[in-house]
């Protein structure tokens, strides 16, 4: 996502301020991916039983990941910088990214003896929080625009109607992963509820209607 989502639009916005923020988002994602890749490499070299290439097969073939993979690939096909930023940082990251990172990995990793992954993921979450802050402020400003605010909110609603169902499908597709840890300290239902509640708060901040799909 750092390369094919944020980097692809970091010169597309109408002001340098927005472009610079998007460029920082790209750097955040690329650094996060690099941290994970280096940790994966260290494990592959240190542990004979660890398959450092298994994640590729999982991403390409595991049924639980295919709705997420499709959503990510569809994000990379969006040409409108504002829609891509909205659908990525506001919708996908809240309903899928943070669901997996915050509501699963950060909750169960240490309980299952992994104290390193939460450190790496926690850094990624901190970066995303900063990215969310500028994204929320940007779309809140557009929603409150005296001349075009109503049209902007209507447009955001159209984007939500397309992407909320897709991201919820991706989120629910990940449900089997919650049953894999030996110490199952959280349930998928609890995690999804926490993620959707945070998503509602973001939507309220940018003053758009809450999609009906979140109440189902």
Question: What are these language model-derived features?
Answer:
Residues 50-90, 110, 149-153:
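Acidic/His metal-coordination segments adjacent to aromatic residues that form catalytic metal sites
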Residues 1-13, 79-107:
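Alpha-helical bundle segments that constitute or directly flank the non-heme di-iron/ferroxidase center
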Residues 16, 20-23, 80-91, 115-122, ...:
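Short, solvent-exposed segments of well-ordered alpha helices
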Residues 94-179:
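Long, repeat-rich segments with strong aromatic
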Residues 1-62:
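Long, hydrophobic, well-ordered secondary-structure blocks that form the structural core
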Residues 94, 161-216:
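C-terminal accessory extensions/subdomains outside the catalytic/core fold
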């Amino acid at each position: 996502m750092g390369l094919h989502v944020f980097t692809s639009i970091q010169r597309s916005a109408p002001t340098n301020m927005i472009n610079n923020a998007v460029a920082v988002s790209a750097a955040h994602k690329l650094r996060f991916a690099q941290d994970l890749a280096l940790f994966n490499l260290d494990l592959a070299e240190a542990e004979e039983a660890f398959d450092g290439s298994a994640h590729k097969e999982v991403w390409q073939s595991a049924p639980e990941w295919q709705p997420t993979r499709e959503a990510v690939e569809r994000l990379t096909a969006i040409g409108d910088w504002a829609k891509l930023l909205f659908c990525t940082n506001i919708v996908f990251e809240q309903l899928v990214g943070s669901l997996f990172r915050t509501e699963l990995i950060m909750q169960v990793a240490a309980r299952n003896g992994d104290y390193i992954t939460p450190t790496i993921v926690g850094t990624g979450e901190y970066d995303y929080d900063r990215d969310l802050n500028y994204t929320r402020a940007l779309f809140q400003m557009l929603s409150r625009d005296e001349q075009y605010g109503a049209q902007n909110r209507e447009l955001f609603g159209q984007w939500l109607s397309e992407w909320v169902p897709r991201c919820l499908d991706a989120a629910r597709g990940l449900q089997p992963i919650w049953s894999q840890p030996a110490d199952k300290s959280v349930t998928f239902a609890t995690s999804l509820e926490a993620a959707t509640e945070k998503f509602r708060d973001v939507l309220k901040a940018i003053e758009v209607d809450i999609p009906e799909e979140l109440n189902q």
